[in-house]
Amino acid sequence: IMASLNMGVSYALTEEEINANIEPNRIGNYAFGYLNDRGVFIVKYVGRSDTDLRTRIKHGIADRETDPAMYRYERFKFSYADTPEEAYKKECKNYQDFGGDKGKLINDRYPQAPDYDETSSSSSEM
């Protein structure tokens, strides 16, 4: 069975595409990757935002500019979630389904659980 992100179509990882397709201040999940020569989206990184998916995805542009060979982030996919808990569960599933625990993703650690301490809610964004 092919693993699925359950995120729909991919978009070019540009400021324009991000702004055009993602509503501000939404909780959700995302994946960065590229299309192989058969047009299949190859997942390189999975993540989530508990506060602002649109802003979080823009970090991928900066990563790619830093090291294009390592961060082969040409396109992104995304989906919204209703709660940080829901986004976290999906991130864990995406991480496992796409071999994060086997070193197939750029993610350097298992997904972090949501931080429910309101005073430090920004820490879950890193």
Regions picked out by a protein language model, each given a short descriptive name:
Residues 1-44, 48-126:
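Boundary/linker segments flanking structured domains
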